[in-house]
């Protein structure tokens, strides 16, 4: 595998340094520190060549848009979060560093761009964390909440706080005078998990323009209520290729428990199934969120074996879906705990994206390329 210096990559691409860095952050060009000078980076030659060849030909706008919306290329502007050089940033702050000390409430204040730190909810909550309760509570608000269109950012931030409290009362029930991570720990009767829950909530609060964030922005762009925005994001998150990827991790662990890690991974790959536990296109050198979380607890033996064997066989490091499932297993949390944690955390990000999209004043309305039967012609004389 050959590598290029920044100067060589820029000459090949005929572009600016900012564009090179953006391509790295989107996972389109792999980069690594220069062994001769760790302050500099080297760029994967094959990735650079592929992009250079792509840009050499003039492509139709519709082709560019179709490729962008599938994966990888920026399709809209956002100041909320980004991934650059294998690091996740929240409004310019390193998310892993921020997670060392911050709570989800402080993360909301940061991502919502000027909001005061959220106070604790006064809701009564439910007996235990429930995703179904969150769906029902949000749906109940949608028909009565005001549309977001035509309202100030200050008014929207106040409503966002209320919507988050609605979600929290369903997903993190309990005493209302405590931070959300403590409420979760108490509802599951696992006080020793509190700090890891805090870190996970912060690390999962936003992740640039992922599938659920895009769904949330589309909903917000139509002027829908913020509760509708979170409802659409939550529905998207439940997909197995997004927030429910932990189920694939659990299935792999179950198979590994019966067959051993190597055979479990071989069987999964032989069946043509993706391994939810490994790799992320935006983190060619490893998911920084996983690294930040895995350093805080001891991996259960089966997870440790799958990690060791899988990273060698697959050639990819474990991702945040693996880390979240492992954390929940390490603290003996309920089986649905990963999606509960993910949903509560990401609600903060969806609301941030909603307010940013509303502020732009733009309706997201792409066109479809028709591939159906030829339209009928009018043969009348």
Task: For each feature predicted by the language model, list its residue ranges.
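Hydrophobic alpha-helical bundle cores within soluble ligand-binding/oligomerization subdomains
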Residues: 2-381
């Amino acid at each position: 595998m050959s590598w290029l210096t920044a100067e060589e990559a820029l000459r090949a691409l005929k572009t600016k340094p900012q564009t090179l860095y953006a391509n790295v952050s989107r996972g389109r060009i792999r980069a690594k520190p220069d062994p001769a000078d760790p302050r500099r980076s080297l760029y994967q030659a094959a990735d650079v060549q592929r992009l250079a060849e792509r840009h050499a030909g003039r492509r139709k706008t519709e082709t560019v848009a179709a490729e962008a919306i599938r994966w990888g290329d920026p399709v809209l502007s956002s100041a909320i979060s980004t991934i650059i050089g294998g690091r996740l940033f929240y409004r310019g702050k390193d998310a892993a560093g921020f997670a060392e000390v911050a709570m989800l409430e402080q993360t909301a204040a940061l991502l919502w761009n000027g909001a005061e730190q959220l106070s604790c909810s006064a809701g009564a909550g439910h007996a235990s964390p429930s995703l179904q309760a969150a769906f029902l509570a949000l749906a109940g608000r949608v028909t009565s909440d005001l549309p977001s269109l035509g309202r100030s950012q200050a008014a929207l931030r106040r409503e966002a706080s209320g919507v988050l409290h609605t979600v929290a009362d369903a997903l993190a029930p309990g005493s209302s005078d405590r931070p959300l991570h403590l409420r979760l720990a108490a509802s599951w009767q696992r006080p020793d998990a509190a700090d890891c829950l805090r870190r996970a909530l912060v690390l999962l609060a936003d992740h640039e323009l992922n599938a659920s964030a895009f769904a949330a922005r589309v909903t917000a762009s139509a002027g829908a209520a913020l509760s509708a925005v979170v409802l659409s994001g939550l529905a998207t998150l439940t997909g197995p290729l997004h927030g429910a990827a932990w189920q694939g991790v659990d299935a792999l662990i179950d198979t590994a428990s019966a067959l051993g890690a190597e055979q479990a991974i071989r069987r999964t790959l032989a069946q043509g199934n993706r391994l939810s536990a490994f790799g992320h296109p935006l983190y060619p050198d490893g998911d920084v969120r996983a690294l930040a979380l895995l350093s805080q607890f001891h991996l259960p033996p089966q997870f440790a074996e799958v990690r060791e064997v899988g990273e060698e066989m697959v050639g990819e490091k474990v991702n945040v879906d693996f880390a979240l499932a492992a954390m929940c297993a390490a603290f003996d949390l309920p089986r649905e705990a990963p999606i509960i944690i993910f949903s509560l955390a990401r609600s903060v990000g969806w609301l941030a994206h909603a307010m940013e999209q509303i502020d732009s004043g733009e309706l997201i309305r792409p066109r479809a390329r028709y591939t159906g039967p030829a339209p009928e012609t009018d043969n009348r004389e």
